[in-house]
Amino acid sequence: MIPQRVSLITIGAYDLPMLRAFYQKLGWEETAHSSDNYAAFTTAGVILTLFPIEELAKDAEITFTQDRNSYRAVSFAINLDEPSQVDSVIEQIREIGGTILREPSDAFWGGRTAYFADPENNLWEVVWNPSAVFDERGAMISY
């Protein structure tokens, strides 16, 4: 049986120094495993890494052809503890240069949500879900 867990997510970066700086501006600290060609950030339960997109394609043995401005059909989420945090986080994202795609609003399913894109158009949701359950480390364990 395959373990039911996601432990590491890698974003293929077009401009690693610029993207690294954006995530540092979020206040996220890099791990000791980061290098000039790789950035790793510990989050609550998942490691987020940044790796040059051409190198990522090479590592996966695929041909790199993606337009940097195209939608990548994947999104990441930052789940929060309170609905008001969605608004304050989006304001912080706006201040550091993130592109707000959807302003904070109440969701039809009872939560609060907003979307932004980082400098390379990776899609992020900032969300409060009233059903979310977090462990003592802040990792979401259920919703």
Task: Show the residue positions of the predicted features.
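Residues within well-ordered beta-strands of beta-sheet-rich folds
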Residues: 10-12
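Short glycine-/small-residue motifs
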Residues: 123-126
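Vicinal oxygen chelate
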Residues: 1-8, 28-83, 87-117, 130-143
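Amphipathic alpha-helical segments
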Residues: 14-29
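Conserved active-site tyrosine of GNAT-family acetyltransferases
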Residues: 19-23, 93, 121
